[in-house]
Design a protein with these regions (language model features):
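Secreted/periplasmic proteins
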Residues: 2-127
Length: 127
């Protein structure tokens, strides 16, 4: 009989999706954004102030898929890794809320729309 122990995982790793959650990747806040609103133009997110190169908005279904709630985002200031096809990773903080019903991560891009980004990415909560 073998006495080899079976490795165990901490509970926080068991409650997160392995490899990330596939989400629609969109952009907002860029010059000429047809869906822009006055709060975004002022740099105000639903949870925290918006910062170029750092802020993202997530839909409620995206938050749920990552095991988060709106109140957790307000109190914890969570960051996510956005894994792009081809190997790139964007590190962003959840500062805003996107209104759509689908799983979506919306990059705050006040410097302009980036046409090089794909339409989908895998999103994981940073430890």
């Amino acid at each position: 009989m073998s006495t080899t122990a079976i490795p165990t995982l901490p509970i926080d790793l068991l409650t997160r999706p392995a490899g990330g959650v596939s989400m629609r990747l969109t952009q907002y806040g860029y010059p000429g954004d047809p869906d822009s609103d006055s709060e975004t133009r002022k740099g105000h997110g639903a949870y925290h102030s918006l910062v170029a190169g750092e802020s993202v908005a997530l839909t409620d279904s995206g938050l749920r898929a990552l095991g988060l709630t709106r109140s957790a985002v307000l109190s914890q200031h969570p960051w996510v890794d956005i894994k792009l096809r081809g190997g790139g990773v964007l590190e962003r903080r959840i500062d805003d809320r996107a209104p759509e019903a689908n799983r979506r991560v919306d990059l705050y891009e006040p410097g302009g729309f980036d046409r090089r980004l794909p339409d989908f990415a895998d999103v994981t909560l940073r430890p």
